[in-house]
């Protein structure tokens, strides 16, 4: 009832740039959904895809590296496609493409489209090895841009307004008049 896939790449990039692959994957999934379903999903930074404020996709990116650098990066994707029921603890926050659009589409076409868009954006990313050329595209999909969000930081949570991302993919927020970069944690 879903799509569960992993994209494995061996990019020649430095370790600190690996997290941006999650953002590229998220944009590719959004592009594929929009192409097939004619609906505009949004990204809840950095790794969730939402439609009507409900999560329909999660992304987990991991890598293997050694002293010479990155050996490979794997971006795992789980998309709720045909699901119609969810456990009680997530039924108010999770959904599927079928529930949100009322239509069934071919999962193979979704996978093909996602892979196409992934490599298209990866090529753009590799030209600068940062998000500068993809920043406006990503921000156009950012679910909470201009809205107050709660940053769940290891040092404690705090409210802030989401402003966008920087060239490294960090979330930029305004917290009490100070611009902060969020590089990890939950939003």
What is the meaning of each model-derived region?
Residues 1-12, 21-25:
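DPxDG-like acidic metal-binding loop motif
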Residues 13-15, 23-41, 51-187:
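Long, positively charged amphipathic alpha-helical accessory segments at protein N-termini or as interdomain linkers
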Residues 48:
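Conserved active-site carboxylates
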């Amino acid at each position: 009832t879903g799509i569960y896939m992993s994209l494995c790449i061996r990019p020649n990039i430095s370790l600190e740039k690996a997290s941006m692959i999650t953002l590229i994957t998220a944009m590719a999934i959004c592009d594929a959904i929009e192409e097939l379903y004619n609906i505009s999903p949004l990204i809840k930074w950095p790794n969730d895809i939402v439609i009507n404020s409900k999560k329909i996709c999660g992304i987990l990116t991991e890598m293997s590296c050694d002293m010479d650098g990155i050996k490979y990066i794997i971006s795992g994707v789980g998309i709720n496609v045909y699901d119609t029921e969810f456990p009680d603890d997530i039924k108010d926050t999770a959904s599927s493409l079928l529930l949100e659009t009322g239509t069934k589409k071919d999962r193979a076409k979704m996978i093909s489209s996602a892979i196409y868009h992934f490599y298209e954006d990866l090529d753009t990313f590799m030209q600068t090895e940062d998000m500068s050329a993809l920043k406006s595209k990503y921000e156009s999909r950012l679910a909470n841009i201009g809205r107050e969000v709660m940053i769940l930081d290891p040092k404690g949570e705090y409210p802030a307004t989401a402003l966008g991302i920087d060239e490294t993919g960090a979330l930029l927020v305004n917290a009490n008049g100070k611009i902060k970069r969020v590089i990890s944690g939950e939003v």
